[in-house]
């Protein structure tokens, strides 16, 4: 007879079910229970940390997409002078923004209070610090004034801390190091409006990975080459943007389903 599964294993399984059912809010709840069960400084497994990341990425991703759509409609209505509509849209946008803030605050609290401190390996430290940078970046996307400035500073600090560890401990072809470079470069481009820095960071990461491509193991080949392609796509987009200001969708690191 099979041994009864622990509450932690049960919640991991429920999180996988929720993912299959695309019930991502519940997936977040199950993974937060997994984090709570990993007490006494115990680390999450690679599978668990990836499930946590996927859960939050989907929950935040839906609202980020909503926010972009509503902001685009707001700009159109403003240009038409429809003040009544603009006022309604702003109220609705602020509702989405409060949801975004709540989600970001939730995962940032978990990262700071539990996950970053318990991480021992270089890959897990970089994974969680990158995640911290990502969620501060999502705050910087819609915050204004001093709140935006603070979110951007916190993003930069987390990404830099992750970069220092990645450069020292992870191979240039490691998918987590590449994903960090991708998202860090997006931050420079979109939040700090520094296309030169963005391009330099992305190009350096791509070139360093290309130079060591023959050392890439079969298990991470797919993940690493996918992120390298996204780095190259962004470089192509950004260099053409700097010439003709054409706005297209910037690529970020994919959800870590297979890492």
Curated annotation (Swiss-Prot):
Pfam families: 14-3-3. SUPFAM superfamilies: 14-3-3 protein. It comes from the Eukaryota. InterPro entries: 14-3-3, 14-3-3_CS, 14-3-3_dom_sf, 14-3-3_domain. Belongs to the 14-3-3 family. This is 14-3-3-like protein.
